[in-house]
UniProtKB/Swiss-Prot annotation:
Its main location: nucleus. It catalyses: O-phospho-L-seryl-[protein] + H2O = L-seryl-[protein] + phosphate; O-phospho-L-threonyl-[protein] + H2O = L-threonyl-[protein] + phosphate. It comes from the Eukaryota. This is RNA polymerase II subunit A C-terminal domain phosphatase SSU72. Protein phosphatase that catalyzes the dephosphorylation of the C-terminal domain of RNA polymerase II. Plays a role in RNA processing and termination. Plays a role in pre-mRNA polyadenylation via its interaction with SYMPK. InterPro entries: RNA_pol_II_suA (IPR006811).
C-alpha cells in the first residue's frame, strides 16, 4: 500500500455533475481529492437544448444557484440542477479549470474521452520538472444524475483498489483489466510526467 494517501483529481467538462459527484463520494471516503472541468466555460442545461446557461469558471456555485432560482425555480428544481448546485456549494465555492491548476496528482480520473484527451494534452504541454508519474484514467460516464452517481461509486471502488496495491506502477494495468471485465466498461489509461 502506498505510504501516503493517493492524491486524486476527477475531471469532467464543467466541474458540475460527474466530477463533483465523485469528489463528494471520494472525500467522504477519506481521499485527498480535487475536481475540475476542462471546458472554456461552465455549461448547465437551460430551457431548451440549444439554450444552455453559460457561466465563467470564476462564477460561484451560489451565484449560479441564485441566477437559476431567479430565472425559473420550477424548471431547475424539477430537472435537479438546483439540488446539484446546492450539493456543489457545500463541497467548494466554485468550479475550477484543470488547465489552471499546477498541483501534482498521483491519479487523474476523467469522465469522457474528450476530457481525457484535453487533460493528457495539457499535461504533455507542460515543462517536465519532477519526472513524477501521474496515471490518467478515463471512465466514460454519461452526463446525467443517475449515471454520475453510478460512475462515482465505480471511481471510488477503483481508487480504493489502487490505494491498496503494493506497487501501483506494476499492478495498475491488471487492476484496470479486472475492472473492465467486472463493469463491462472500457478504460483508457496512460502515464504522463510532471
Amino acid at each position: 500500500m502506498p505510504s501516503s494517501p493517493l492524491r486524486v483529481a476527477v475531471v469532467c467538462s464543467s466541474n458540475q455533475n460527474r466530477s463533483m459527484e465523485a469528489h463528494n463520494i471520494l472525500s467522504k471516503r477519506g481521499f485527498s481529492v480535487r475536481s475540475f472541468g476542462t471546458g472554456t466555460h461552465v455549461k448547465l442545461p437551460g430551457p431548451a437544448p440549444d439554450k444552455p446557461n453559460v457561466y465563467d469558471f470564476k462564477t460561484t456555485y451560489d451565484q449560479m444557484y441564485n441566477d437559476l432560482l431567479r430565472k425559473d425555480k420550477e424548471l431547475y428544481t424539477q430537472n435537479g440542477i438546483l439540488h446539484m448546485l446546492d450539493r456543489n456549494k457545500r463541497i467548494k465555492p466554485r468550479p475550477e479549470r484543470f488547465q489552471n491548476c499546477k498541483d501534482l496528482f498521483d491519479l487523474i480520473l476523467t469522465c469522457e474521452e474528450r476530457v481525457y484527451d484535453q487533460v493528457v494534452e495539457d499535461l504533455n504541454s507542460r515543462e517536465q520538472e519532477t519526472c513524477q508519474p501521474v496515471h490518467v484514467i478515463n471512465v466514460d460516464i454519461q452526463d446525467n444524475h443517475e449515471e454520475a452517481t453510478l460512475g462515482a461509486f465505480l471511481i471510488c471502488e477503483l481508487c480504493q483498489c489502487i490505494q491498496h496495491t503494493e506497487d501501483m506502477e506494476n499492478e495498475i494495468d491488471e487492476l484496470l483489466q479486472e475492472f473492465e471485465e467486472k463493469s463491462g466498461r472500457t478504460f483508457l489509461h496512460t502515464v504522463c510526467f510532471y
